[in-house]
Amino acid sequence: MNPGGGLDMQAILQQAQQMQQQLMAAQQELDETKVTGSSGGGLVSVTMNGRGQVEDVSIDPKAVDPDDAAETAQTIADLVLAAIRDGERMVEEIQQQKMGPLAQGLGGGFPGLPGL
């Protein structure tokens, strides 16, 4: 609050601007962060950025059985899905680490502004 008892809009705007900059920096960090989910003991791996976007999929040739193409295709599909889920779990953890403190800052509200 300012000396007149009203809201200090300048302070509120500065705080909002600072939070926006912190959010943008955290989002940039997430874009640059890489995680690798894997399955099948490493036969399949999926690389994702911190926002959860898949950037690479790697399948070890040992995962392929040339004598049973149909079974191999289904197995590989299952392994890819499991690797993606593993990567998503890691992404969620990273997002909580990077964005959690900012979300808590929002919950703290703006001084002198009830409920915000």
Swiss-Prot record:
Keywords: Cytoplasm, DNA-binding
Record-linked SUPFAM superfamilies: YbaB-like
Pfam families the record matches: YbaB_DNA_bd
Gene3D superfamilies recorded: Nucleoid-associated protein YbaB-like domain
Location of the protein in the cell: Cytoplasm, Nucleoid
Keyword Cytoplasm in record: yes
TM segment ranges: none
Quaternary state and interactors: Homodimer.
PANTHER family, sorted: NUCLEOID-ASSOCIATED PROTEIN YBAB (PTHR33449:SF1)
Name recorded for this polypeptide: Nucleoid-associated protein Tfu_0045
Organism of derivation: Thermobifida fusca (strain YX)
Lineage: Bacteria, Bacillati, Actinomycetota, Actinomycetes, Streptosporangiales
